[in-house]
Amino acid sequence: MKYDTVIIGAGMSGLSAGVRLAYYEKKVCILERHTTIGGLNSFYRLRKRNYDVGLHAITNYAEPGTKQGPLSKLLRQLRMTWEDFDLRPQLRSSIVFPDCRLHFTNQFSVFVDQVAAAFPSQIDGFRRLVQRIAEHDALNLERQVVSARQVVSEYIRDPLLVDMIFCPLMFYGSATPRDMDFSQFVIMFKSIFHEGFGRPFEGIRLILKKLVRHFRSLGGDLRLRAGVREIRHTSGRATSVTLDDGTEIEADNILSSAGAAETLRMISPGSPPVKAEPGDISFVESISVLDCAPADLGHRDTIVFYSDSPAFHYERPSEPVDLRSGIICSPNNFDYSEPLEDGRIRITALANPHHWMNLPDDQYVAEKDHWNDRIIDSAVKHIPEFRSHVIDTDVFTPRTIRRFTGHLNGCVYGAPEKFVNGQTPLSNLFLCGTDQGFLGIVGAMLSGITIANRHLLK
C-alpha cells in the first residue's frame, strides 16, 4: 500500500502531525518501533501502579475558552476540545538558589513582584527584557541562532538573577550546554513564566489516548512494533521505508520524529552527506511513591528548580549524576477537584549518558540504587524529609531513555543544532519533534502541526 505520508514515531509530534494530515483526508501511516505510544512522554504500569515518563507538567497553560496562545492554537489545529486535555493549573512553583528563592504561579505578575522584591536594582532591566521577549518572533522557521545569555546580559547585570531565570528554562527545554538559542529562550520564558504549568488528572495517558482515538477516527493507520530500518531514495527523493521485518511501505512524503542523527542513519547508502551530531543532555529521574500526599508533610510546591551552587551548571556532568542541581516535581500539587490515588515525588538531575550506557548489566541495578539515594539526599535540602513514607520506587536513566525511545545517548532535547524548517537533504523527507526545535509537550505537538502545514498540506 502507498501512503501520502508515512510518519516515523508515535510521540507527541508524530501523532499531532498525523491528526492534522488525516483531518484533511490524507492517507497517513504512523510507524512506531516500540510496543506503546508516546516516545519521550509516555506511561507504563509497574507493580500495579501507573507511572508517567517525561511529563512533569504541560507548559503554556491557559484557562479553558482562552482564544489566544499556543494551547488554544493547538486545540484549534487538531480540532480537539479543552475537555480532551482536562488540564488543572499548578499551585505554585519555586526557583531555589543559595540565599535566594523566587516563587511563580500561572500569573506572571507574581514572578515580576518576586524579582522586584529580591533584585530591586535589576527590575528595570528585567522589565525591558520582558518587552524584548514580547517583540521577538521566536516561531520564525528561518530564524538565526543568537546566544540567549548574551542578549539577557544586556538587560540584567546580576549573574545570580540571570542563572535563576535560566535554570527552569534550560531544565525544561535546552539541548545545548550552558546557553540557549534566544528564540528557544523566548519560547520557554513565555511558556513557563507567562503561561505556566498544568496537568491532566489522569496524566499523559489521557492526552495520548485522545490523540490516538482521534487519529484513527479520521482514518489514520497506526502500527506498533513497526520499526523503520531504512529510508530508501532515488534522485534526491525518499521513495519508501523498509521495516525491521523487511516489509516495504511506499509514500509520497516521509515525516520523522526519530531525531536528526537517528533519521539520517536510516537513509540508505548513497545519500547526500550531512552532519547531525546527537545531543548528550540527559537525565536520571527518581520516582518515589508515598503513603501520603506531599502536602501532608508540608510540601505544597508543584515544582522546585534548585541549584546548590550560586552559578548554575547545565552541561553533561563528569560524574554519573550532577548532584548540584535538579528538579523536584509533585504531581499531587496541582489544583485537582479530588486527590490522586497516591503521593508522588519525582526528582530529576543531569546525568552522564556514557557512564550509564557502558555499565555492565550486573552493576546497573546497584548503581541505580546508589544514585537514587544520593539524589534524594540532595533534594531533601529543599523539601521536607519523606523517605519514611516511601512505599515504592522506580528510577530511569539515559539507558532507559535509549532503550524505549531509540534516542542516541538517551538525549531528551535532541541535537544542539536544530533543523528549524524541518527540511533534510532529501526533498520529501522532513523532521518534526525535538530536532526540529519546538520542545516540551505543547512544543512537540505544535512542531508536528507546523511541519505538516508547511510541507505536507500543499
Functional labels for PLM-detected ranges:
Residues 188-238:
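Helical element adjacent to the flavin cofactor pocket in flavoenzyme catalytic cores
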Residues 2-121:
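N-terminal glycine-rich phosphate/pyrophosphate-binding loop and immediately adjacent elements
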Residues 434-456:
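A conserved FAD-binding loop/helix module that cradles the flavin
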Residues 97-180:
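Rossmann-like flavin
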Residues 158, 162-175, 323-328, 381-438:
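A glycine-rich dinucleotide-binding beta-alpha-beta segment and adjacent secondary-structure elements
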Residues 62, 66, 143-148, 191-213, ...:
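Short beta-strand to alpha-helix junction loop
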Residues 292-399:
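C-terminal segments that line or cap access tunnels to active or ligand-binding sites in enzymes
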Residues 229-339:
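Mid-domain catalytic core of redox enzymes
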